């Protein structure tokens, strides 16, 4: 147990039939994604942290302060948290501004009033302040709900699938606001999701739940490239890398960005990019093919010298997952077992990873 971080050692249910059993410490910085399939215990864990659900037994400490143990249970309103639910849960009789002012009163913090203008600008709420919730779209409601949670001046922000009730267009509208929130505020965020594209775009760290237990926890890419983790199975298997913009090819609308010791050609994004800017890129394992030699007569632009780390079984019995080292970075390739057999893949083998598609996610 450490004095810093969110320490969780809790269980719900009985010893014979546990619903949730967690023993870990979550870093109180950046965004930690709590990821897993439906029914894995994500929302239950978040509600325990918030005090909305009382764990059957165990301890919850936040930076050394006891929120729950054998003798005490801190009520939700006494925990320094903000909570954003799947549904915005705005007060229907108050305007957007009224909802924000309610949060400021609850905060009882002089800095909350000073924070109002910054939060309104950051989340693009200027034109919405005089509207009532029934006059707002789903995405607009969630932006107001996020602002309301921030104006409580929380030490920890909990977000329970805040985009789950939105259609794809609304999700794409709100994601840049969440990225801006991450950049502008130091408040640590626990972000519950079962959508890998959201996690890849937002998270610094990742905690994976399955059947009520923690099966992986750590830095985002460490978890994504752990071939024993559920995240490294199936069609969404991916890695997330930082790439530095080196040059632009305006003729072909491409940018060249560097990962550790290799270059990636990437379709230029709609927004402007600068030389030396760091981009977050996502590479799906299914978009990586392997070759024993470098092919120049191919439509694939990205051919990276790589070394095989391991070959693992996939949940699909016809597929295999190959873990690769590209300099100090790690890639995953999802190929057929027949292809792995044909190439006689072995650990430490040198080969070429051909990356069909690279997506900029941040």
UniProtKB/Swiss-Prot annotation:
The keyword Zinc-finger does not apply. It catalyses: molybdate(out) + ATP + H2O = molybdate(in) + ADP + phosphate + H(+). It is found in: Cell inner membrane. InterPro entries: AAA+_ATPase (IPR003593), ABC_transporter-like_ATP-bd (IPR003439), ABC_transporter-like_CS (IPR017871), Mo/tungstate-bd_C_term_dom (IPR008995), ModC_ABC_ATP-bd (IPR011868), Molybdenum_import_ModC (IPR050334), Mop_domain (IPR004606), P-loop_NTPase (IPR027417). It is an enzyme of class 7 (translocase). The keyword Transmembrane does not apply. It is a peripheral membrane protein. One of its GO terms (molecular function) is ATP binding. It comes from the Bacteria. Keywords: ATP-binding, Cell inner membrane, Cell membrane, Membrane, Molybdenum, Nucleotide-binding, Translocase, Transport. ATP binds at residues 36-43. GO terms for cellular component: plasma membrane. Residues 297-362 form the Mop domain. Pfam families: ABC_tran, TOBE. Its EC number is 7.3.2.5. Residues 1-236 form the ABC transporter domain. Part of the ABC transporter complex ModABC involved in molybdenum import. Responsible for energy coupling to the transport system. Belongs to the ABC transporter superfamily. Molybdate importer (TC 3.A.1.8) family. The complex is composed of two ATP-binding proteins (ModC), two transmembrane proteins (ModB) and a solute-binding protein (ModA). This is Molybdenum import ATP-binding protein ModC. It comes from Saccharophagus degradans (strain 2-40 / ATCC 43961 / DSM 17024). The lineage of its organism: Bacteria, Pseudomonadati, Pseudomonadota, Gammaproteobacteria, Cellvibrionales. The gene is modC.
């Amino acid at each position: 147990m450490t004095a810093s971080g969110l320490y969780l050692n809790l269980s719900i249910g009985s010893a014979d039939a546990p619903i949730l059993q967690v023993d870990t410490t979550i870093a109180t910085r950046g965004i930690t994604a709590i990821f897993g399939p439906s029914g894995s215990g994500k929302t239950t864990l978040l509600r325990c942290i918030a005090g909305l659900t009382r764990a059957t037994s165990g301890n919850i400490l936040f930076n050394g302060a006891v929120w729950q143990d054998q003798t005490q249970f801190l009520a939700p309103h006494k925990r320094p948290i903000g909570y954003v639910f799947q549904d915005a849960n705005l007060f229907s009789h108050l305007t957007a501004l009224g909802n924000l002012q309610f949060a400021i009163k609850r905060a009882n913090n002089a800095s909350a009033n000073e924070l109002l203008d910054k939060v309104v600008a950051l989340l693009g709420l200027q034109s919405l302040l005089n509207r009532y919730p029934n006059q707002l779209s789903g995405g607009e409601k969630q932006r107001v709900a996020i602002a309301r949670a921030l104006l409580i001046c929380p030490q920890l922000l909990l977000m329970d699938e805040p985009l789950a009730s939105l259609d794809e267009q609304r999700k794409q509208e709100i994601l840049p606001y969440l990225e801006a929130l991450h950049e502008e505020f130091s408040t640590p965020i626990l972000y519950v999701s079962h959508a890998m594209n959201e996690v890849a775009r937002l998270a610094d760290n990742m905690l994976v739940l399955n059947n009520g237990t923690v099966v992986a926890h750590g830095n985002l890419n460490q978890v994504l490239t752990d071939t024993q983790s559920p995240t490294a199975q199936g069609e969404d298997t991916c890695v997330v890398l930082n790439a530095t913009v080196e040059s632009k090819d305006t003729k072909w609308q491409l940018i060249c960005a560097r990962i550790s010791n290799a270059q990636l050609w990437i379709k230029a994004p709609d927004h402007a990019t600068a030389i030396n800017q760091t981009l977050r890129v996502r590479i799906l394992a299914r978009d990586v093919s392997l070759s024993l030699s470098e092919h120049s007569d191919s439509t694939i632009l990205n051919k990276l010298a790589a070394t095989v780390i391991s070959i693992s079984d996939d949940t699909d019995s016809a597929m295999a997952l190959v873990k690769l080292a590209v300099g100090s970075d790690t890639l995953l390739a999802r190929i057929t077992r027949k292809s792995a057999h044909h190439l006689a893949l072995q650990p430490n083998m040198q080969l070429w990873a051909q990356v069909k598609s690279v997506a900029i996610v941040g």
